[in-house]
From Swiss-Prot:
PTM characteristics: Binds 1 heme c group covalently per subunit.
Alphabetized SUPFAM superfamilies for the sequence: Cytochrome c
Organism name: Methylococcus capsulatus (strain ATCC 33009 / NCIMB 11132 / Bath)
Stretch forming the signal peptide: 1-27
Residue ranges the record marks as coiled coil: none
Entry protein name: Cytochrome c-555
UniProt keyword annotations, A-Z: Electron transport, Heme, Iron, Metal-binding, Signal, Transport
Gene Ontology MF, one: electron transfer activity
Amino acid sequence: MDHKKTSIRTTALAALVLGAVAAPAFSAPVDQATYNGFKIYKQQRCETCHGATGEGSAAFPNLLNSLKNLSKDQFKEVVLKGRNAMPPFEANKKVAEGIDDLYTYIKGRSDGTVPAGELEKPQ
Ligand code: HEC
């Protein structure tokens, strides 16, 4: 038996197994913008009206549907200026400064590329 060959094969197998263990299990990798948007969505209370998943309820629009129709500018307009029972957020620094990230997060939810619920902080 060629001992050298076997040991190389064993090393390769070990690397494969270790690699599989090191990879995060089933976590959706998101970029920094999406993660920031998610934090703003939660912390600035969008979720109290539009729901933790963004899907709204009888009284509040489903933002996953809304973002299939609203342009980014229309999104910014309604969030910053408000509309009817939607409060204006332009005086909220976190929202006003993070509006692009907020859009990225909700757009990702709408497109189905960002899962509902907690997101892992990007490395
Ligand atoms: C107090 C409850 C409340 C909060 C908090 C709230 N919204 Fe709204 N939002 C509403 C209501 C009600 C509407 C529907 C307004 C209307 O009828 O014109 C709405 C509408 C919207 C729309 C437009 C939807 C469409 O289809 O045109 C967007 C986008 C939106 N909200 C995003 C947000 C974001 C982002 C936040 C957090 C920064 C937020 N909302 C916080 C109640 C809320």
